[in-house]
Regions:
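N-terminal signal-anchor transmembrane alpha helix of single-pass membrane proteins
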Residues: 2-24
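Metal-dependent phosphoesterase signature
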Residues: 126-145
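Charge-rich, solvent-exposed alpha-helical interaction surfaces
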Residues: 32, 50, 54, 122-125, ...
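Entry/capping segment at the start of metal-dependent catalytic domains
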Residues: 27-102
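Short His-Asn-centered micro-motif
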Residues: 70, 137-138, 160-162
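Glycine/serine-rich loop-strand microenvironments at binding/catalytic pocket rims
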Residues: 140-156
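Juxtamembrane transmembrane-helix termini
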Residues: 21-27, 251, 255
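Metal-dependent phosphoesterase core characteristic of DEDDh/y 3'-5' exonuclease domains
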Residues: 65, 87-94, 98-127, 152-257
Length: 258
């Protein structure tokens, strides 16, 4: 009888020990999952802060300008096919950043241009600007072009995402306003969209390389993936700052390879 009781106690002891081990393992697993969630949340919040920092209005600083990053927005919704043709539209917005040799912004200017045409509802949503806000803040196209002409310098390299498209729209507007910009056609050029194509990270159904958007190139160069989404911002400012940020990465790569 005593032997039987001892055996039962031994079995109970083993069961209690096994249960304790299992509970400890479950607590450790819960703690690991919680730590992982905290780590992921911290990483996500860090990425959000980084994106917000890159898309925040830069503070003016002194320095020697080496790059002029340019962006234009049209009054009409233009698809990819039209962007590759000679199609032109009055400018809705014109913006630029002057950057130093390392890509740090020295000065940013961005303007909405007052035009007589109407934008479609789809375009208003894309550009993140209501008609009321546009009419209240827009300036004369000639005034914006004049301000651009004042920052053009022979030592600058002209940079844009789809640079040929932006130049075509800009030169068409300059001709309409009779404000010559002869120097801009003489500057060295750097098209970020073409550089993104050569990287080959965006592929079509046939696995051929495709042109990335300004956001896709920005996310690729900064290893961001498709999330989190970009914060709300006027498209003209967003694309300008995305392009400037992408250029900074490319310049840092070039410096490290020297």
């Amino acid at each position: 009888m005593a032997l039987l009781l001892g055996l039962i106690l031994l079995i109970l002891l083993l069961l209690v020990r096994q249960l304790g081990t299992r509970l400890s393992a479950q607590r450790a697993l819960r703690q690991e999952i919680l730590s992982l969630k905290h780590s992921q949340a911290a990483e996500a919040s860090g990425i959000v802060r980084f994106i917000e920092q890159e898309l925040t209005a830069p503070q003016p600083r002194s320095g020697e300008a080496c790059y002029l990053v340019l962006d234009t927005e049209a009054m009409e919704l233009i698809d990819e096919v039209e962007a590759e043709t000679s199609f032109v539209s009055p400018l809705f917005a014109l913006g630029w950043q002057l950057l130093d040799a390392s890509g740090q912004c020295l000065r940013e200017e961005s303007y909405m241009l007052l035009q007589t045409g109407e934008r479609s509802e789809a375009l208003r949503q894309l550009q993140q600007v209501s008609e009321r806000c546009y009419r209240a803040e827009a300036i004369a196209p000639s005034e914006a072009l004049q301000r651009l002409s004042e920052v053009l310098q022979p030592q600058l390299t002209l940079v844009g995402h789809h640079l040929a498209y932006h130049l075509r729209q800009l030169q068409s507007e300059a001709e309409q306003q009779r404000i010559p910009l002869p120097l801009i056609a003489q500057l060295p050029q750097r098209c970020l969209m073409q550089e993104g194509l050569r990287m080959g990270f965006k592929r079509g159904y046939d696995d051929s390389p495709r042109y990335p958007s300004a956001e896709e190139l920005f996310r690729y160069l900064h290893h961001l993936g498709s999330e989190p989404p970009l914060p709300p911002l006027r498209k003209a400012l967003r694309d300008l700052r995305l392009s400037a940020s992408s250029l900074r990465v490319l310049l840092s790569w070039e410096r490290s390879s020297d």
